[in-house]
């Protein structure tokens, strides 16, 4: 019964229905770490920030895993608790995360800096080696998109358009709306990152 609810929650496209399935599983097995994890992630996708934090804190205690940090930090940001979000972003446990999760945290931090009105800091925090090393990773599209968004918020529209183009090329499945953003800014969507030059990110 619990497993079926968890699978249903994972497969459900509608955030509210996913949350409802996960919540039933949580009522049946509240002391199981994976149940609290799935419930927390479902709550996050449904915009239930406080509950997401509560469930993911429990999952963290029960499993000993730190992989929830990016989602927890983003939930704190959504609640307007920027200092708490930054505490998570800079916690010692970040060193235990995969590089993909660390990049997720940097993307959250960039958003926090924008919320603080520090648009240039939002750009700088994303200037990591993976931004310009020419390699495409599963999370490159998200990184390029966040960088483009930060550039746009900083008033650097031409650079932002270039990076939205890169994001669209690195995101063939269309998981972001990078292609739409390119069109909004009057750019052209290219199909391959090889079509771009080797220019480094702006300072």
Protein language model regions, located:
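Alpha-helical segment of the N-proximal tetratricopeptide repeat
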Residues: 1-20, 24-27, 31-34, 38-44
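Residues that mark the junctions of alpha-helical repeat units in TPR/alpha-solenoid scaffolds
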Residues: 1-2, 32, 65, 102, ...
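Structural register within alpha-helical repeat arrays
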Residues: 5-8, 39, 72, 109, ...
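Structural motif corresponding to the intra-repeat A-B loop/turn of tetratricopeptide repeats
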Residues: 12-13, 46, 79, 116, ...
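Solenoid-like repeat scaffolds
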Residues: 23-31, 57-64, 91-99, 128-136, ...
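TPR alpha-solenoid repeat register
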Residues: 35, 68-69, 143, 177-178
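Extended, charged alpha-helical interaction scaffolds
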Residues: 83-155
């Amino acid at each position: 019964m619990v497993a079926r609810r968890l699978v249903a929650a994972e497969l459900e496209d509608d955030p509210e229905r996913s949350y409802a399935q996960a919540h039933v599983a949580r009522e049946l097995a509240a002391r199981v770490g994976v149940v609290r994890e799935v419930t927390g992630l479902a709550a996050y996708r449904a915009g239930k920030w406080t509950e997401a934090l509560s469930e993911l804190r429990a999952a963290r205690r029960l499993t000993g895993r730190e992989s929830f940090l990016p989602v927890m930090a983003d939930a704190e940001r959504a609640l307007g608790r920027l200092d708490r979000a930054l505490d998570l972003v800079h916690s010692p446990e970040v060193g235990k995360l995969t590089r993909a999760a660390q990049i997720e945290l940097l993307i959250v931090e960039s958003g926090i800096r924008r919320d603080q009105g520090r648009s240039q800091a939002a750009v700088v925090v994303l200037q990591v080696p993976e931004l310009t090393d020419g390699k495409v990773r599963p999370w490159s599209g998200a990184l390029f998109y966040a960088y483009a968004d930060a550039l746009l918020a900083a008033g650097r529209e031409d650079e932002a358009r270039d990076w939205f183009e890169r994001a669209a090329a690195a995101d063939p499945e269309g998981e972001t709306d990078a292609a739409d953003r390119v069109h909004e800014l009057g750019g052209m969507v290219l199909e391959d990152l090889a079509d771009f030059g080797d220019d480094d990110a702006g300072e």
